[in-house]
Design a protein with these regions (language model features):
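Activation-segment/catalytic-loop signature of the eukaryotic protein kinase fold
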Residues: 20
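C-terminal lobe helix-coil module of Hanks-type protein kinase domains
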Residues: 118-208
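Activation loop
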Residues: 106-118, 125
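Activation segment signature within eukaryotic-like protein kinase domains
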Residues: 57-58
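Protein kinase catalytic-loop region centered on the HRD/HxD motif
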Residues: 62-73
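AlphaC helix of the eukaryotic protein kinase fold
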Residues: 1-8
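Conserved short submotifs of the Hanks-type protein kinase catalytic core
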Residues: 24-38, 42
């Protein structure tokens, strides 16, 4: 269903889904080919990003998500691996409709979801509640990592990691990046607020 909904979203910052269907009992997606790399690759190459470049990439990500949220589609698995940077350096979000709701039971599988767990919103962890605000939380964690060079919560154990997201506030980016603009710090704090209602309602609101 999400894949079909994603196919109807026309936005330059979303990888286009051209067709969905079933063949020999298997579901398939026909998607746009993007020539480029994912954000994780760039993070590994650069270590950290300037505030200007971070805000550009985050802004393009939010623009893509705004179209999705208006169409009633929530991504549920925003992380650097799912943010593609095309050969012009622009964002294209991938894996709409491929992301599955994660339950606490699957989170306990050692190591499997460590990459995803670092970006999961508290309500996703506690209630399997997929919301536009959950996407924004993940975007905020990603921005935090781009500026600081690491995510705010770390652990080798995914269960410990998700416990931190549920029970601890995300530290201000100012604790990791001394002298950072107060407006940028406030913006990230808004995106990563622990309570759903304390975040912007959706990506369109976050952009205003």
């Amino acid at each position: 269903r999400e894949a079909r909904s994603a196919a109807a979203i026309a936005n330059p910052h979303i990888v286009q889904v051209y067709d969905t269907g079933e063949f020999d009992g298997l579901d398939y997606l026909v998607m746009e080919y993007v020539h480029g790399v994912n954000l994780r690759y760039e993070m590994n190459q650069q270590g950290t990003f300037s505030v200007r470049e971070t805000l550009r990439i985050i802004g393009e990500t939010l623009d893509g998500l705004a179209s999705a949220h208006r169409a009633g589609v929530v991504h549920r698995d925003i992380k650097p691996e799912n943010i593609l940077l095309n050969d012009r350096g622009h964002v294209q979000i991938t894996d709409f409709g491929l992301a599955k709701t994660v339950s606490q039971a699957t989170l306990s599988s050692t190591g499997i979801l460590l990459g995803t767990a670092a970006y999961l919103a508290p309500e996703m962890i506690e209630k399997n509640q997929a919301t536009p605000q959950g996407d924004l939380y993940s975007v905020g964690i990603m921005a935090w990592e781009m500026l600081a060079g690491n995510v705010p919560f770390t652990s080798d154990n995914p269960v410990t990691l998700v416990f931190k997201h549920v029970h601890e506030d995300v530290p201000s980016i100012a604790t990791a990046c001394k002298g950072i603009n107060e407006g940028v710090a406030a913006f990230l704090a808004h995106l990563t607020a622990r309570a759903v209602e304390a975040r912007p309602a959706d990506a369109s609101v976050a952009l205003t």
